[in-house]
């Protein structure tokens, strides 16, 4: 019989069901689990993992991960709260936010406070601590544009630290936290937000939806409305949001594509490359609304993979690999999954392995 083990402020639990904690609703059991509310909790959890020779899997909002049925590792569930104003002037406000804050709730809070910049990122699932990891983005805005620094516990140096936005090396769905995922545990994120509205409306149908009501609140509401009209609620249709990254191709590759598919949605990048809409590729490959067993691509948004009925990780992999195959056959583009894949030892695996 397993017993819970208590430390100063933290509790280790055994054989914990993680289905409520991952938005794809995969049936997953963790051999060891703890919820951390402070840096001291993190240090105690890491000491426990070292003592028991366990790998560590850091769980945030569970909205960007693919988990196996059994994880033999210590799952550290982040629950560090707090929204603290550090400083402000007439143009900017600096705010330090706990990694365990719900992202969407934080965005709503900034709008109520008349802090601007994050409204395009409303309704993205997950927690604040996960936002820098893959540099979350939507409707022409990436969170890295408004991050000043990221506060971390450095597992290599065994101490806390702060990493500037420049040193995070933010790019499309990427940061240093993806390059070295086992080193840093994000504890807080410091944002530098605008105090004067500067609405970004140059993406898709957003400008038309906002119309003449050029307020941050209306922009936020329109983003929420558009997302709700296209994207399924994970509580009703378990999913991880956009399942594939929008592929970025060079000029030569784009010229080949546009010559063959003249209506392909595309977005020129600053470096001369071109971003292609993955959802369109999936739709054209015949996968919008199509299922393979209990897993399929959503009928309103082909980019979203849905667990329709108690799918396993094997079911999910079978489906997304079939989508990759069909898209590659038609367009000679290999789609890259966004969510992180873990093995039963709590370690990150490559999707191609």
UniProtKB/Swiss-Prot annotation:
What transmembrane ranges does the database entry give? none
Q: What class of enzyme is it?
A: oxidoreductase
The family database entries (PROSITE patterns) matched by this protein are listed as: FAD_PCMH
One GO biological-process annotation of the entry reads:
cell wall organization
User: Keyword set for this entry?
Assistant: Cell cycle, Cell division, Cell shape, Cell wall biogenesis/degradation, Cytoplasm, FAD, Flavoprotein, NADP, Oxidoreductase, Peptidoglycan synthesis
Principal localization reads: cytoplasm
Q: In which pathway does it act?
A: Cell wall biogenesis; peptidoglycan biosynthesis
Leader sequence residues: none
Q: Name one Pfam family in it.
A: MurB_C
Q: Where is the FAD-binding PCMH-type domain?
A: 26-196
Query: What cofactor does its activity depend on?
Result: FAD
Source species, domain of life: Bacteria
Q: What is its EC number?
A: 1.3.1.98
Record keyword DNA-binding present: no
**MF terms in GO:** FAD binding; UDP-N-acetylmuramate dehydrogenase activity
Is the keyword Cell cycle in the record?
Answer: yes
**Catalytic residues per the record?**
173, 242, 338
Q: Where in the cell is it found?
A: Cytoplasm
* Catalytic activity field: UDP-N-acetyl-alpha-D-muramate + NADP(+) = UDP-N-acetyl-3-O-(1-carboxyvinyl)-alpha-D-glucosamine + NADPH + H(+)
Show the GO cellular component annotation of the record: cytosol
* The protein's role, per its UniProt record: Cell wall formation.
The UniProt family comment states: Belongs to the MurB family.
Q: Under what name is this protein listed?
A: UDP-N-acetylenolpyruvoylglucosamine reductase
- Gene behind this protein: murB
